[in-house]
């Protein structure tokens, strides 16, 4: 009998393959020891009805959160958003509180970052700026720090808020930025000018074992291109020179007064002792003695002679209002002009030059660094690379005994420069703007695929077609008011950047054959020719005034005729682009040149790094102006890098 019951239990478990294990065990254990076949079948029929006990409905359970209010006192409760359907919102197990967001776990966030492909498989979303991160060369700045800097400088809206001398402050309006109705400092000027004016606050006192550390203040000015970095360091330097000059003048007056009193006392003693011999006085300097070299108080170092001319122009402009002596030294100057500058009997306050030239002068005249109190290293990323760093470091070491402030300035901070500054100047104060390593959003970037029709890989033809399209196009509403009134064509200046020096001459020659006024600028170009070419792209011509329109109207033969504005010419089509000038250049023209007259830049070759992207496109959007960039891409170019640069520009993010 026992064996029969055991056998029946085994058969019963075989009949329940689709019933859960718990129900199966309950059914089998509830069977009697002696069972017939009919009772077994009846048990199988009702086995699926065996379920665990249902939980108590919510309407029969007291809420433990009665005292917990989800609405503040005095506020109205938000209306509940009903679900679609006749029974929507019924029997919900979770409260749908839309006023607060449910915290999500890391696993859930990771799952939501995946998206499904067409075949239903999960596909990982590509990492943002992956191509730029793979070839990153710039030192990043956290966005939290960028936000804090924005809030810090938001209260400064005028140059009058800076503790500058009245003459220095007035020179901004009269000399540096004349003719502007509203003059406000840029972000780097709001950061740098107050910091540099507080002398002695940037370098703490050396601790034990750090007596060999530099005693002068150290600053790093890092800001985007075209943001006014030159005025940011030049105004505090000029202010310090004028304050020191005033103190020296007071000291000279005091010394002269003491000397006069001393002479009067000696005269009284001489009258009392008439028979004593006079002591030999100091020997006078012979007339034919060699002249001493000038001893500037501030030196501004730049990498190229073009930058010497540009920054020297600003230094000379400020000197019209603030009286000081300045000079420029570059390799394209004649030996006679250099000698005249070095041995000027009137002295010198500010010297703008290149590291190699001033270092070679110091070998023969070491006293040129004896009075330097301010040293500015502009374009620091270039002056601290392998080619310039030995001379730059030598100049810093030789000026260190009398130096008060060292100012480094750059638009890009590579990781190599960042590491070198942390080793050499660990106490340097970093003044970084929120938009560092970012191209302004007012600059638009277009991409031309040269592999498509009608170019078929001919990069020269794509460049010429883009220039012709820009030269012939133009909305009169985008032009200056003077050109709208007189109907004249607005002159256009375009810069074409190439990677190789040989390519520049080839591209310029091809563009000339297509009726485009194009010239090339490389190291092979003579210094005089370089100055003439850059003058056309760095100086902006004033637009025609309404008086010119009146003069044109008065010269008409028919006084009753109606003047038409921007009348299109006939069907005659010229083979030359008369109102457009093109400059084909290498990276020689991408560093610091203030190309205010340029509104379009064409990247003939894709730049090698994001640093070149920033400097080349940085020729646009200067001082709040708009600009347009065009990059030509082919089969062998990194299209993913160009795409991410364009996306970063649209987002206003830094090119990491």
UniProtKB/Swiss-Prot annotation:
Could you say which enzyme class this protein belongs to?
A: hydrolase
Please name the PROSITE patterns in this protein's record.
HELICASE_ATP_BIND_1, HELICASE_CTER, Q_MOTIF
Q: What does this protein do?
A: ATP-binding RNA helicase involved in mitochondrial RNA metabolism. Required for maintenance of mitochondrial DNA.
The reaction(s) annotated as catalysed by this protein in its Swiss-Prot or TrEMBL entry are: ATP + H2O = ADP + phosphate + H(+)
Every Helicase ATP-binding domain range = 210-431
DEAD box, short sequence motif: residues: 378-381
Span of domain Helicase C-terminal: 480-656
Which protein are we looking at? ATP-dependent RNA helicase MRH4, mitochondrial
Q: What residues does the transit peptide encompass?
A: 1-46
Which residues are recorded as binding ATP?
A: 223-230
Q: Which GO terms describe its molecular function?
A: ATP binding; ATP hydrolysis activity; RNA binding; RNA helicase activity
Q: Which organism is it from?
A: Coccidioides immitis (strain RS) (Valley fever fungus)
Record bears the keyword Transit peptide: yes
Q: Fetch the InterPro entries from UniProt.
A: DEAD/DEAH_box_helicase_dom, Helicase_ATP-bd, Helicase_C-like, P-loop_NTPase, RNA_helicase_DEAD_Q_motif
Family per UniProt?
A: Belongs to the DEAD box helicase family. MRH4 subfamily.
Which Pfam family is an annotated match for this chain, by its short name?
Helicase_C
Q: Where in the cell is it found?
A: Mitochondrion
Stretches of Polar residues bias are at 60-71
GO CC term (a single one) = mitochondrion
Q: Which UniProt keywords apply?
A: ATP-binding, Helicase, Hydrolase, Mitochondrion, Nucleotide-binding, RNA-binding, Transit peptide
Q: What is known of its domains?
A: The Q motif is unique to and characteristic of the DEAD box family of RNA helicases and controls ATP binding and hydrolysis.
The EC code for this enzyme is 3.6.4.13
Q: Where is the composition biased (Basic and acidic residues)?
A: 96-125
> Motif Q motif at which residues?
157-190
């Amino acid at each position: 009998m026992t064996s029969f019951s055991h056998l029946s239990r085994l058969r019963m478990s075989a009949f329940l393959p689709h019933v859960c294990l718990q129900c199966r065990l309950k059914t089998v254990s509830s069977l009697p020891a002696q069972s017939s076949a009919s009772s077994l079948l009846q048990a199988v029929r009702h086995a699926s009805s065996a379920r665990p006990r249902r939980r108590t409905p919510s309407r029969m359970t007291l809420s433990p959160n009665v005292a917990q209010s989800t609405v503040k006192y005095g506020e109205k409760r938000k209306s509940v958003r009903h679900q679609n359907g006749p029974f929507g919102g019924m029997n919900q197990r979770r409260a749908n509180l839309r006023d607060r967001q449910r915290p999500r776990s890391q696993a859930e966030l990771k799952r939501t970052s995946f998206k499904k492909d067409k075949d239903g498989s999960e596909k990982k979303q590509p990492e943002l700026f992956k191509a730029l991160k793979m070839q990153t060369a710039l030192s990043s700045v956290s966005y939290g720090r960028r936000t804090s800097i924005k809030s810090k400088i938001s209260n400064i809206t005028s140059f009058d808020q800076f503790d500058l001398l009245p003459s220095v402050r007035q020179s901004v309006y009269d000399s540096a930025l004349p003719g502007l109705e509203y003059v406000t400092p840029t972000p780097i000027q709001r950061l740098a000018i107050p910091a540099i004016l507080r002398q002695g606050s940037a370098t703490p006192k050396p601790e034990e074992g750090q007596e060999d550390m530099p005693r002068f203040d150290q600053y790093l000015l890092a800001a985007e291109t075209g943001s006014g970095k030159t005025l940011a360091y030049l105004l505090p330097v000029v202010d310090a020179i004028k304050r020191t000059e005033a103190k020296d003048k007071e000291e000279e007056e005091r010394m002269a007064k003491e000397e006069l009193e001393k002479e009067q006392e000696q005269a009284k003693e001489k009258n009392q002792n008439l028979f004593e011999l006079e002591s030999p006085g100091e020997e006078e300097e012979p007339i034919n003695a060699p002249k001493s070299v000038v001893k500037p108080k501030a030196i501004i170092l730049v990498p190229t002679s073009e930058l010497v001319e540009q920054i020297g122009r600003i230094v000379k402009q400020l000197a019209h209002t603030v009286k000081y002596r300045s000079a420029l030294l570059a390799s394209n100057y004649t030996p006679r002009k250099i000698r005249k500058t070095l041995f000027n009997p009137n002295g010198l306050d500010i010297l703008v030059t290149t590291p190699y030239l001033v270092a070679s002068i110091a070998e023969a005249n070491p006293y040129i660094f004896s009075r330097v109190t301010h040293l500015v290293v502009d374009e620091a990323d270039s002056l601290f690379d392998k080619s310039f760093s030995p001379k730059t470091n030598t100049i810093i070491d030789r000026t260190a005994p009398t130096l008060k402030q060292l100012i480094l300035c750059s638009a890009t901070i590579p990781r190599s420069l960042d590491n070198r500054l942390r080793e050499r100047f660990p106490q340097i104060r970093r003044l970084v703007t929120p938009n560092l390593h970012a191209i302004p959003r007012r600059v638009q970037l277009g991409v031309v695929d040269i592999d498509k029709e009608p170019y078929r890989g001919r990069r020269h033809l794509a460049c010429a077609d883009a220039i012709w399209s820009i030269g012939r196009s133009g909305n009169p509403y985008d032009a200056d008011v003077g050109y709208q009134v007189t109907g004249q064509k607005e002159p256009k200046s375009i810069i074409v950047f190439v990677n190789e020096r040989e390519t520049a001459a080839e591209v310029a020659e091809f563009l000339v054959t297509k009726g485009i006024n194009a010239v090339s600028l490389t190291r092979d170009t003579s210094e005089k020719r370089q100055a003439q070419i850059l003058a056309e792209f760095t100086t902006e011509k004033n637009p025609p005034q309404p008086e010119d329109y009146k003069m044109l109207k008065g010269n008409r033969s028919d006084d009753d005729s109606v003047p038409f504005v921007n009348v299109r010419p006939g069907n005659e089509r010229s083979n030359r682009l008369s109102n457009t000038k093109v400059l084909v250049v290498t990276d020689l023209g991408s560093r610091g040149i203030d190309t205010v007259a340029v509104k379009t830049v064409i990247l003939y070759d894709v730049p090698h790094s994001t640093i070149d992207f920033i400097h080349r496109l940085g020729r646009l959007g200067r001082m709040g102006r708009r600009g347009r960039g065009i990059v030509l891409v082919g089969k062998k170019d990194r299209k993913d890098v160009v795409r991410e640069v364009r996306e970063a520009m649209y987002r206003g993010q830094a090119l990491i």
